[in-house]
């Protein structure tokens, strides 16, 4: 007797099953078979699971489970990133909330780092617990934290090697500087936001009594102004930085200023003389064609400064106040207070020409929201030219494949325009740079201080202090493919399978970190191991909300995947979306929108429904609009699968089968042939990373072919007196269902395991879990001789669909029996009707089936056409005749529309000449079928 619950309730078994899988060690690499390795992009240890994580991890897990079932030695390497800046912010915030008066600075470096480790021990595994709830089948025993001893040793080794090879150097460059965090940050941590600002035009006087003839023209080329000027007009959005100007720049071919090449100007407010230089960088059509150059505070100006050997004047302190390089009256002012004073003094001097509104792209730190400064500071850098050249070769030679392939263009663009990489950060939490300085400022690099002293003969009397900076997190993340496999320690490499699991099989990640992480892993892995880090890179789109908006806390449109899985009340959802906002004033707007979209909160969908939704939405190369309605639909899909399994189990009580079914009915042969086709499609879709087509194929087979059709077609055989047909039908039901559960398992692991545990024993299967059962293969069943059965059942389906449509349109109650009259048809139709009479009668509630002779008068009837066969349901006692006339008119219009579509295609020379011959022929056959149907419908309409 089946013990399967009467209703689908994922909360009753999902967590239980995961605990069983993990305890049994099913996710640990077997060490047997061909290796298949997937790298998890390590999420921040501070983070919680968001929809982007859930999206990518679902696809990774499907790939891992699929290959595990195919006998591969699967390793899914997981772990977390120490997330330097984010972690320091979280711990600093927690210290403030504790109310003990402790701060980062009051604790000091060692005390603060100790607090970070305390926090990590208490809260650092949150995201891994959430990943388990999603169903990720990763080897948790190998979970790695980037600050663990092994990865930390890899970081030191990589730094020392690159330094000794001349690839790492210390120098003064412009970096993105966050004045709140007081550290350099990466480009990825900068958000460019369009904001309203101003463009100020300022007169810069020419030095040395130089003047020139200034001429202006209107749009038609007519001269509107001619005068002698002893100044140039410069436009800027940041007037405070003029205190650090070291040149004014013109285009060398700008006819307006040809006489001013090599002139000088007197910088207002400072009195400094700076040169007028020429450079092709200048856009002559923008503004006056004159540009101020501030090399220490603008990335483009810095490049100009390098080309022209200009001095660099840094105006700011680490907190973006004015330093000693500016005139004394500005020193100590905040940058925006300095701006006000500069503008006031320019106006007093009469050199502020114009102020007008201007749209700005303002760089803001993604964590603090502060305006980021291009800041001149001493940092550590990696020389990228040679590394990037090799990294590009590895991709263009095909050793690494991008999916979809168009992302190679993005990769190439970045690699061909690469700059040296700033790897140092002014933080405490992270991998401290393995460099020491003596009192004279000389630098020594080594794995530790003892090695440095021994290598350079430095006695204890020579004081050394370690660089206080840490490496940015991308430096350790670039080593992830091989540091997790024990590199550089030979014993650890042997124990963790370095030689077996590198390169990994595929990296699943987003396009936004192709450069920041993917490219750097390619370069570093090649540099340190001589191998590629992975064979394939599958680039996903970004998850957006149903309206296509980016999900963000500030917009209040974030969906927590665990809320979709387990459900959340509207009050809790509102509280989650409105707490911790950077702009608390947005809370009422967010609450209103949330209550409108989710008046009753979010119901529990279960992990499988979310996972199947993600797969179905995973189209190539597009951002994903996540619609919660799709998840509801796929929860219904899981429920339908549950109910179909209950039907099969209840109709196979006491039955035990082994081997492949020997089908006795056409319906069995049809479903087995369909199973073979969907199995082949499944393998092809996995090979091409087409998870959307995979979900579509499996959904179509499970819902339509198996649940809607085969289960219904099986009922007559199960209730028939032919015991052999009933037995083979039971065997086929169980066999196809068990195969379907295996096909679905990588996408929906929980419900398939729960159902499979009930189904498998009836087929003599003793494997402990579906996750280790072999994946179905095309050819598991020899369906080569089933073509005629397939055609017969497709005909039967057409008959049933046509008659059901008639019954529905006539509003005939499901239980009421009707007569069926048949007329015309092909030579195959009569024997088919005879063979399928019991199925037709059972499925359509037919009182009788009778044939009419050609030309025989027919009673007023509702008509349908299947091929050349006319199906008639006498209307007497069934329907209002006026309603039937309306129905026929509607059906005639529908068929006429289909004929119009066919004629449109066949009337197009482009279609007929360019489409495959088989497609054109298929369209002609469709036109013939529709024309036959229209003739029959018109004849029937004429009779009533």
Swiss-Prot record:
Residues 878-942 form a coiled coil. ValRS has two distinct active sites: one for aminoacylation and one for editing. The misactivated threonine is translocated from the active site to the editing site. The C-terminal coiled-coil domain is crucial for aminoacylation activity. Catalyzes the attachment of valine to tRNA(Val). As ValRS can inadvertently accommodate and process structurally similar amino acids such as threonine, to avoid such errors, it has a 'posttransfer' editing activity that hydrolyzes mischarged Thr-tRNA(Val) in a tRNA-dependent manner. Monomer. Its EC number is 6.1.1.9. A motif ('KMSKS' region) lies at residues 550-554. GO terms for molecular function: aminoacyl-tRNA deacylase activity; ATP binding; valine-tRNA ligase activity. A motif ('HIGH' region) lies at residues 43-53. HAMAP family: Val_tRNA_synth_type1. It is found in: Cytoplasm. The gene is valS. SUPFAM superfamilies: Anticodon-binding domain of a subclass of class I aminoacyl-tRNA synthetases, Nucleotidylyl transferase, tRNA-binding arm, ValRS/IleRS/LeuRS editing domain. One of its GO terms (cellular component) is cytosol. Its main location: cytoplasm. This is Valine--tRNA ligase.
